């Protein structure tokens, strides 16, 4: 009986944490994200940073579901799904790159996966859904990405595992 009570209490505490996560990652909504790069040759610049192994970012403005943020930093995300030969590469977007504390609903980093190895577009979002039932895990949903006014495609939008994630899920960033 004691063990059952402990299980119910800890499960309830965990579920409360999960339910309080940002509505930004609700799976019943496809987010709309517009990136407007400062430079016309943004793809060449990002390809160059990637090939050279540089950790730098290039500047863009971003509109997320109608809210606009300026001077965000953009780079490619990851390694295995990035290629200078792909038109649709994954993106890591830092909202507070130049403007301190700039965020969208408390989120300061967007991670857009290109889903290049998942033709169903289901695996990543579904696996995070399952994981969150048993342990802390990132939230994920979908976003249509527009670049300089052109629809670039459907991406998965995955919550970054950063200090905010650690504090929300474990009470400390350490």
List each model region and its residues.
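Bacterial Sec-dependent N-terminal signal peptides
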Residues: 1-21
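Phosphate/dinucleotide-binding and metal-coordinating scaffold of catalytic cores
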Residues: 19-174
